[in-house]
């Protein structure tokens, strides 16, 4: 649900070669040895710092280079030389590199990516891609035999949504027209085996998710899982036959006769309370050409027939573990299957106060590690912890909390089997905005150790927002520090000693040195029985004797946060330094990482408590700080944030906010997808929570928006939050004769990635009018 405006990433990929290993992809690399030759950028006005301008906050001027390699082995990283285009293999222990693939091989392919087979003898080249849904692309695939220098087109040269190499063979598993194929390469040719024959484009999906599973459950375009030995393939099938369509009109190019009639795009999209996809799980022996599909049935006696497949992965060769939930996702059953279809229900979990937050489990010998809410011993309630269970006599027993206290596990990353250690991302004590890399012994005898907390950025500040990319077995990792300063990446060994610098983003740092920066202040504000986090960006020349307009950016979706330590240089940098507007973020009830009590306040009542907090906390700031101009206070948000902005204006009886913008907003939860909405709201039926849906429908509350300046912005081709949402609010406002502005972007999707100049110039004019600065 959360909007991920991926324009920057897309532009990088469009102009670059991408390296992939085992389905992972990263942008093209700038050769570390060559970065020193980048010319120094001249500072503006003979060294004087200048404000950010609007255009450079959306045109990638201040985009950081990311980790632009992919681990191939436990000590080697694949990357693309940015200057000559060769694919190189870099040994982090010796500092030496070798060329694996000459740039001439991919020179004739458009928008190329490469994925190497297990022994580097074959290369799958993805090219000529078009975007699918949020995470998926459809591309042509050509396999190059390095020894014979021959090319083989996959799927007759058609675009395909997914391909992966076997981990142990020169064999490619791919999906074509929603069926799975297995193609084995050998000297002189290849053999192809069709694994499924039930696929129907846009209706029955084998090995890839449909729209709702890609967006809301898997967060990935991948729905097949290869066993570690490469012998077996488990995969999901999504049957959308009974799922209703959303119809999107694509209008095409102005004046083009081919677009005399709009083109209709139909997408299977289950809305709240409607029929969901029917999902099944299967496994097959890839090495035995005569093998048949084996069904891995869901535990319908526990989660019901209308269930959700949340996770699936291999515990070890021959054993796959799947997590199934009921439709509203508050009951979950872990099932252990063997490759003959035998099933064993090994662990059950139920959440009575809210919804389940499920992550794929990790494994070590007899241990299974899951993320589970555990009591913190404080009034904040339970926190998501790494929890170790032992598989014994067909069940998971002996639960051990590996990360006790009031810190939250954000993501389980990897188990280092040689050292019996778990790596994970988590918050810091009392600091939910911090994201650190931790490790903890699986024995449970030692407290977690923060591995990123003592790492210093080039500016000398402690790293407070980290991620890690691990090598095959976890003996090395790339530590990615994204805050509080620009991205800095170091290569670290298993003893947690930094052995090299991968990326310092020196060019970005030089450019930032020529810009004035906001003054950042963090506050705790007590409201509605909780301590709420507030972050304000103040103008560089801030004077507390003056009054400044305030603009709040809001998301406020369940289990999300807006206040983090990540360094960003977006719209806030412009409006604060160039327009002297205070920019604010508020994390109230329903936000993440502060305990289950605060989190589950939002359960079954979206659009209530999180909206109240935005209003009351902003009013508190206005009353406490004389330098905030209460007559020039606005709010804006995108996606769920657009919903929040609209609901704030509709329910703000005291007119704390004078104006607002909603970009691609939900306006009624009956129009949004089932798997997201029902997780937090239940079903829109009289027997369940129909009244909750009605209470949170913005179109039923438009009278509260009268007299306030409001702008609606939406793209007509939004496959996530449909244009219908905005049109229904439009109709309610018009029927009530309430004035508002609307900007429609023809054929634009949820991210509005093709119209940023017009979008931000439009919003800038709106804010100039509302907040009182000259445009």
Swiss-Prot record:
Listed InterPro entries: AB_hydrolase_fold (IPR029058), Peptidase_S9_cat (IPR001375), Peptidase_S9B_N (IPR002469), Serine_Prot_S9B/DPPIV (IPR050278)
Catalytic activity: Release of an N-terminal dipeptide, Xaa-Yaa-|-Zaa-, from a polypeptide, preferentially when Yaa is Pro, provided Zaa is neither Pro nor hydroxyproline
Documented EC number(s): 3.4.14.5
Active site location: 639 (charge relay system), 718 (charge relay system), 750 (charge relay system)
Cellular compartments per GO CC: extracellular region; plasma membrane
Family annotation (Pfam families): DPPIV_N (PF00930), Peptidase_S9 (PF00326)
GO MF annotation terms: aminopeptidase activity; dipeptidyl-peptidase activity; serine-type peptidase activity
Entry's family note: Belongs to the peptidase S9B family. DPPIV subfamily.
Identification of the protein by name: Venom dipeptidyl peptidase 4
Native species: Apis mellifera (Honeybee)
């Amino acid at each position: 649900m959360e909007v991920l405006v991926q324009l920057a990433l897309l532009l990088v990929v469009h102009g670059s070669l991408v390296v992939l290993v085992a389905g992972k992809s990263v942008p093209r690399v700038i050769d570390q040895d060559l970065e020193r030759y980048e010319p120094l950028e001249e500072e503006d006005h003979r060294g004087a710092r200048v404000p950010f301008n609007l255009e450079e906050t959306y045109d990638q001027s201040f985009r950081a280079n990311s980790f632009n390699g992919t681990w191939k082995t436990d000590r080697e990283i694949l990357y693309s030389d940015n200057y000559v285009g060769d694919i190189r293999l870099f040994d982090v222990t010796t500092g030496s590199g070798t060329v694996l693939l000459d740039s001439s091989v991919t020179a004739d392919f458009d928008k190329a990516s490469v994925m190497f087979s297990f022994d580097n003898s074959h290369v799958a080249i993805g090219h000529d891609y078009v975007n699918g849904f949020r995470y998926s692309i459809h591309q042509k695939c050509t396999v190059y035999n390095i020894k014979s220098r021959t090319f083989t087109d996959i799927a007759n040269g058609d675009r395909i949504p997914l391909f992966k190499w076997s981990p142990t063979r020169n064999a490619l598993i791919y999906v074509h027209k929603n069926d799975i194929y297995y193609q084995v390469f050998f000297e002189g040719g290849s053999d192809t085996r069709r694994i499924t024959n039930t696929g129907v484009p846009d209706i029955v999906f084998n090995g890839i998710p449909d729209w709702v599973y890609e967006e809301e459950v898997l967060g990935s375009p991948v729905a097949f899982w290869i066993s570690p030995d490469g012998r077996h393939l488990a995969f999901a099938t999504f049957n959308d036959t009974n799922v209703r369509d959303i119809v999107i009109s694509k209008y095409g190019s102005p004046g083009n006769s081919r677009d005399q009639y709009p083109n209709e795009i139909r997408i299977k999209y289950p809305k709240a309370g409607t029929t969901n996809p029917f999902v099944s799980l299967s496994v097959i022996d890839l090495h035995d050409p005569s093998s048949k599909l084996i069904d891995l049935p869901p535990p319908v006696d526990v989660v019901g027939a209308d269930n959700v497949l949340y996770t699936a992965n291999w515990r070890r060769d021959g054993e796959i573990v799947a997590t199934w939930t009921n439709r509203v996702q508050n009951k979950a059953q872990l099932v252990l299957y063997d490759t003959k279809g035998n099933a064993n229900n090994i662990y059950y979990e139920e959440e009575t106060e809210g919804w389940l937050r499920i992550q794929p489990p990790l494994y070590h010998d007899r241990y299974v590690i899951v993320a589970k809410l555990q009591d913190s011993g404080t009034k904040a309630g339970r926190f998501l912890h790494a929890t170790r269970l032992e598989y014994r006599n067909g069940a998971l027993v002996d639960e051990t909390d590996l990360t006790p206290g009031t810190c939250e596990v954000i993501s389980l990353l990897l188990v280092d089997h040689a050292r019996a250690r778990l790596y994970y991302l988590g918050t810091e004590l009392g600091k939910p905005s911090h994201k650190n890399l931790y490790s903890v012994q699986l024995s449970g005898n030692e407290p977690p150790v923060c591995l990123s907390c003592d790492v210093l950025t080039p500016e000398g500040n402690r790293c407070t927002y980290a991620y890690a990319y691990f090598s095959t077995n976890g003996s090395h990792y790339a530590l990615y520090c994204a805050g509080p300063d620009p991205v800095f990446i170091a290569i670290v060994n298993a003893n947690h000693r930094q052995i090299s610098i991968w990326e310092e983003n020196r060019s970005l740092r030089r450019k930032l040195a020529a810009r004035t920066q906001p003054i950042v202040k963090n506050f705790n504000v007590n409201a509605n029985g909780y301590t709420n986090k507030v972050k304000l960006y103040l103008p560089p020349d801030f004077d507390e004797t003056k009054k400044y307009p305030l603009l709040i950016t809001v998301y406020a979706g369940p289990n999300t946060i807006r206040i983090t330590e990540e360094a960003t240089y977006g719209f806030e940098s412009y409006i604060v330094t160039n327009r002297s507007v205070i920019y604010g973020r508020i994390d109230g009830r329903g936000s993440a990482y502060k305990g289950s009590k605060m989190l589950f306040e939002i359960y079954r009542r979206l659009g209530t408590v999180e909206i109240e907090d935005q209003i009351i906390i902003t009013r508190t700031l206005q009353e406490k700080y004389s330098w905030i101009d209460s007559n020039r206070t606005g709010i804006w948000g995108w996606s769920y944030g657009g919903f929040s902005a609209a609901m704030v204006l509709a329910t703000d009886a005291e007119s704390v906010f004078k104006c607002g913008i909603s970009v691609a907003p939900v306006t009624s939860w009956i129009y949004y997808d089932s798997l997201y909405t029902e997780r937090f709201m239940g079903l829109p039926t009289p027997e369940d929570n129909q009244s909750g849906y009605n209470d949170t429908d913005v179109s039923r509350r438009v009278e509260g928006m009268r007299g306030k300046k409001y702008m609606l912005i939406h793209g007509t081709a939004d496959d996530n939050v449909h244009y219908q949402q905005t049109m229904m609010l439009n109709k309610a406002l018009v029927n009530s004769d309430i004035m508002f502005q609307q900007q429609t972007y023809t054929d634009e999707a949820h991210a509005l990635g093709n119209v940023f100049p017009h979008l931000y110039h439009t919003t800038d004019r709106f804010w100039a009018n509302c907040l009182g600065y000259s445009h």
